[in-house]
Amino acid sequence: MSVPKLAAPRKHRDLVFVSAGLDLDGGGRALAGRLLARTCCELAREWEVGCEILALGRSGAPAPARYFGADQRGLALAAWRRQLSARRISLVFDLIGPARVQAWLPGPLRAPYLVPLYGIEVWRPLGWERRRALVHATVRLAISRYTVERARPFCPELNGAHVLPLALEERSPEGAVDLELVSHLGTGFLLIVGRMASGEQYKGHDQLLETLPRVPGARLVVTGDGDDRRRLQGRASDLGLRGRVTFTGFVSEATLAELYRRSTALVMPSLGEGFGLVYLEAMRAGKPCVAARDSAAEEVVADGATGFLVDRDDPEELAAVLGRLLASPDLARRMGEAGRRRWREQFSLERFQGGLRPLIENLVGVRG
């Protein structure tokens, strides 16, 4: 009687992607998460391994996902249970918060995992869970050298972090254009895009509002929302900027793309970005960027070529740069074209996926 052969043990690990939220209104962090999730799903299909997505929020995943709403504990328990099962898996987290579950697992039970480092979440003293999650990560992935340098005092183990800049693909934006809004705004305005949070007043909204009176005729469109919006609106009113500053609130992707197209430049002199995806959005749209010196923007914006880097606390310097761009459409156009070329060459989706591929190969056990 012939004896049936046992199936060979599985060599490769399935992927489990664990997300702090992928919703379209989640800002740059969620966009970066969608970028990671998409790459993981595409690589899993190529390698014929499983890819499961567990996420807070309600939507945004590039493949079927299990959503947990605001239930962080439920997400952590799901990630825990996946590792205690007999299944061979590797995990990719899209933020250090959900990765805290790894701190509670002893080494023999802990699956290989990747943790990305964005910025402010690691630029401060870390609790023991976050610190341990970073220390034991198989792969630590930083989105800029700036992020690593600012985080190093709080976690010296980051010496081994891989630096991989974020990217944007070229695609048609989702949603409908708010024609009434864009028609009202016209063209030739300055644009700042980002969340307005009272606990994160680092994006440069205040500095930009205080500079605007020094630039005669300049108009500013402020896109985004948050609990600090009311204060900023009051500040604009106090500065006598009625009619020159428009707060749009949250807008669709299609409306945002049209705002970029109609603007003269993106102006966001932020000191709190670990990278700054909005700079890539502007570059993709062929618009120059005005950003802060001594920030992560130095790794994205080529000073004098694709925009300007300024001392954001020097209103005269900022005003001079804004006035120069508004007075010279040819200069703004040339810088915008250079920015679009730089985006294609340095920050394309293909370049990002090529850099991420060997890191995920290591987690899954595939060798290219």
Regions found by a protein language model. Give the residues of each.
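Short alpha-helical donor nucleotide-sugar binding micro-motif in glycosyltransferases
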Residues: 250-251, 258-263
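Conserved donor-binding/catalytic core segment of Leloir-type glycosyltransferases
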Residues: 16-18, 181-213
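Aromatic "clamp/platform" in nucleotide-sugar-dependent glycosyltransferases that forms part
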Residues: 271
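Short hydrophobic beta-strand element within catalytic cores of glycosyltransferases
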Residues: 288-291, 301
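Nucleotide-activated donor-binding/catalytic signature segment of Leloir-type glycosyltransferases, i.e.
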Residues: 230-251
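Short His-centered aromatic/hydrophobic patch
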Residues: 93-99
